[in-house]
Amino acid sequence: MIERSFSGRGPEIKLPAGAIDAHLHVYLSGFPALPGGPGLPEGQPGLSEYRQVMGWLGIHRFVITQGNAHHTNHANLLAALKETRDVARGVAAIDGETSDAELEILKDGGVVGTRIVDLPGGAVGLSQLEEVDARAFAAGWMIAIQFDGSDISDHVDRLSSLRSRWVLDHHGKFLRGVVPDGDEVAMLKRLVDGGRCWFKFAGCYESSFEGGSDYSDVAEVSKVMATHAPERIVWGTNFPHNTATRTTDYPNDAALLDTVLNWFPDDRARHLALVENAEKLYGFQSIAN
């Protein structure tokens, strides 16, 4: 059994007005897990729990990402967006069988992107990258892409050819480790420099060999990227931390926020990641206007 904390002592770093959490999942009652993906997280943390976290951390807007448990069935995502449309956007999981009619329903419901997860349990893998890119580009959507970043050399040419704006999830998710001056990071920099690639700070614990509380190995690469291209970084909580299956593994969201946001070189870079960059990538109205 896992016990999650949704409130507590606030973070030391105060989030700016309009701060956007660019990666979270919610699990509403009545929407079962589908074959091929993981099961639902214990307790099915939903919008009421996430709203507590919003208040705790000072989040103002957010992006609900389709959970792997629901694969390509978007009923849960659309129901959650219906309740939160004024402050939320959605990222779906479309594939070659998704109809044009469903795409219109998703767009009308607040979806602004789709995801590819080329890992066990993912609904749509890199085998469909070009097809998904074509449909996302036509819809004006972004793509969130997740795979073992240690294999980036196998995919860099295809990723460089994408027409859609896209974000590499979870600090690159280098599951076999990475060093800041390695070839993998050099390739990542080139992708970001191409103008259509973003880099997401979220779920650092999923690929860290060093572990908490500082996740120093992931921190080294993330600091390099935040300095190299502060205009291409977004941040997310990764709520409800689905890889944590025991209470002792569940991170304190306020402490984790402070840890990760200290990887930015300065306040301006933090503000870009938390507000302006995410506004551009996910189609939120600019609070500057």
Locate each region found by the language model.
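Mid-to-C-terminal alpha-helical segments outside catalytic/metal-binding sites
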Residues: 1-18, 44-61, 230-232, 246-289
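A generic "structured core" feature
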Residues: 19-25, 128, 132, 242, ...
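Conserved, mostly hydrophobic/aromatic
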Residues: 23, 54, 77, 106, ...
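Catalytic pocket-lining loop regions of alpha/beta-barrel enzymes
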Residues: 126-235, 243, 280
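Glycine-rich phosphate-binding "P-loop"
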Residues: 33-44, 61-65, 107-124, 247
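Hydrophobic faces of well-ordered beta-strands that scaffold small-molecule active sites
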Residues: 20-24, 62-65, 88-92, 114-116, ...
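Active-site gating/metal-coordination segments in enzymes
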Residues: 1-7, 71-157, 193, 200-207, ...
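Alpha-helical scaffold segments that flank or form the walls of functional sites
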Residues: 35-84
